[in-house]
Amino acid sequence: MLFRSEPKLLRTRLLQKEGGAEALARIVKGYPAGHLITVPPGAEYKGAPLDGLSELQEAAGEANWLGETDVGSNAWSIAGSRTASGLPLVAGDSHRGLDAPSVYYQVHLSCPGLNAIGSSVPGVPGALHFAHNDRVGWGMTYGSADTQDLFVERFREGSGRREYEFEGAWRPAEVLDETIRVRDGAEVAMEVTITHHGPVIAGDPRSGWGVAIGDPGLGKGTPWPDAALAAMKASNMLELREAFRTWTDRVNNYAVADCEGNFGYLHAGKIPVRGQANGWRAVEGWTGRFEWEGYIPHDELPTAINPEVGYAITCNQRVAAHDYPYYVGLNFTPEFRARRVQRRLLDLESGAATVADMARIHGDM
């Protein structure tokens, strides 16, 4: 959904209206300095006229009725040294709105080699977001990663084909004729233009301009059943991390605990490798300056396994500090929910935390 690109549309329009980057910087602030970060600094890692933007911004706003504004959640895990049982605990709650029909349904899948319970999405087998089996459990929050880019493209018509400009040369664009079947209505014919950045979703290439969207989910997509099955069969946190290797979209945070005493935080999904400039606005697709260079390697995504502080908290706040070597995103939620969870956890008597305590913290949010 386009809600991930709405901040870029807003900043692009402000840049046009306010007349420059300095004016924009006074209006749009980044993540507040000193606010809580999921994976703190010091963690080691391996490794022109913009036609169509106004209509795209309007379309994104109209799409909000589908419920995408209700994203966000809380999740945390704590070390066994802080619990009455001596084993780690994990807690998570979804901030979904009251959907009808509901987006989540609780399922319990039990068969030889599999015993898992959690939240499933209708039409998709397995439980991936909030779930546990006999050995490992996890809670999910939205990762707020910037995985969509908007590319303003230059087009021309000629020689019986449509072309777009890239690095001073003209390339053939792919043009598809699609038919949308409408129940109880007439079919709708649609021409779709595709560049190497992605499909054009705004503007009119015949006029010379269009806006293409780049999104990891537009490629081979997410093999959800494969990831869900591997996750439900995982026996510990490391196996769960491996299960998420094939996950593409959306990018999520996971608070995790297992029966071997491991706890912590995992980030899962495909995040394009590119500069932070892509995150601020719609970019010029014809220059070659804003290209993707693959995806952040799965083993180098933000991760905290058995952190020394004894807990891991993810409440949609920034996931990695400035020393993280890759650009992840700009639009994170301020720390306030995460800081409240942290305070409540630290108020608990060390070595005495229970499931009931976790439930009370949920009720405090």
Language-model region placement:
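Substrate-recognition/specificity elements adjacent to catalytic centers across diverse enzyme folds
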Residues: M1-L89, S94-A100, G118-S119, A127
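Short helix/loop capping segments that flank catalytic or ligand/cofactor-binding pockets
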Residues: R11, G86-L87, L98-S102, V107, ...
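N-terminal leader/propeptide and maturation segments of large enzyme subunits in energy/redox metabolism
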Residues: R13-P41, G47, G208, A212-I213, ...
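Flexible glycine/proline-enriched surface loops and loop-helix/loop-strand junctions
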Residues: G72, S120-P122, P205-A212, G219-A228, ...
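Short active-site loop/helix that positions an aromatic residue
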Residues: R96-L109, P225, A234-T248
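Hydrophobic alpha-helical segments
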Residues: P122, Q148, D249-L348
